[in-house]
């Protein structure tokens, strides 16, 4: 209870931070008594404060959900003592990533939440989770090595890792050099964001984890990669040399991801593919390189964080209520669990882009920005975005048809369920539905936390005007380099970096 209350208070504090950053400008903190660019600078501008606020909503809802579910069922096999502190460590890493004003501390933030994610992914130590965890660790280590290599290239080229000052000095380098370094960052962040062709690891690892773990991973971890790409694109590599490449990546990410989704029988795996697909929309906005495109990307990220997390929490409810997340084993949920059906249908339609939900509004913002760009590649992306939205809706309605509307007796394996609900420790043994323990027993807190997140995601529809206004201002301030650089460097862009003795004098 104390942890949930603390997480709830964080939501309020970060709402205040958005107001402060929006009305009073960028907020900076110089850590350890050293000013930028030598010291560690924490930066809260409109973009980072928006991401912090949305992440706090997700972290609060998932913690509430986790504490409410089988964590209090008295099961000694559930590693509760490991989950909660590791979850807090992951939260710290995500927050540090959003606030970092230099590339090295961005790297540190990534490493902190990745270490926590290794533990969370393999909780319960089932063979399937350990196998998926090994692959996840290997991919994450490769991403971290590429990130560190890119960071070293920046320092070797411009003598600083402070993003504001690095952006100034990058302008003096040849275009080819800047493009090569930025391409290295795209690979590093692309692995974390799961963009094509660096996405194959995600659908193989996320579905194996517990639902609460998958929910927070899907909602936040990939978006940290997207945020990092926005940040370095808008502050360090401002020339737009690789925008056309990013457009192609965005198109392929959308199409390949959604094609994978419509072929799935497991709901978790299907959701994992839709997660990959919709990262493509955010890359679309970044690649346009305009204020309208970036605003659309930020708006869509806010929408997607809340909607995708709520969908994974609903899958957890389905698993506990019906004993499976396999479509070939599901049916009749609309009649046996109407509340779960409603909690699924609203975010599913939202993700599919049905008007007037925020998913539709975010896509319209991106399509309008693409039309303003006017290039043939932008028009191809617009077509890809529309097709992806339609196929996403098809995939979501396929789950609705088979899992909620169909009679369970008509399902190919409708009588096969998990022997008991899986909380954190994986339990993969199956029994006939009549022999299952705890049939349909879902704690109220799991419903309430999921409903809270569904309500939060739906509220974007009604608050679309104010939210799009602040994302517009966030995009404008991100594109106006003088504002960010002045706030971080304290109007001293020529401050020394390598010669610390001269700096001390």
Model regions and ranges:
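Hydrophobic alpha-helical transmembrane segments in multi-pass integral membrane proteins
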Residues: 25-94
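Single conserved hydrophobic/aromatic residue that forms the stacking wall/gate
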Residues: 2-8, 12
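C-terminal TM-helix exit segments that contain a strictly Trp-centered aromatic cap at the helix terminus
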Residues: 13-22, 148-155, 351-355, 460, ...
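Peri-membrane helix termini and adjoining interfacial loops of integral membrane proteins
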Residues: 22-34, 157-166, 321-322, 364, ...
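Hydrophobic transmembrane alpha-helices and their helix-loop junctions in integral membrane proteins
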Residues: 61-74, 87, 91-104, 117-364, ...
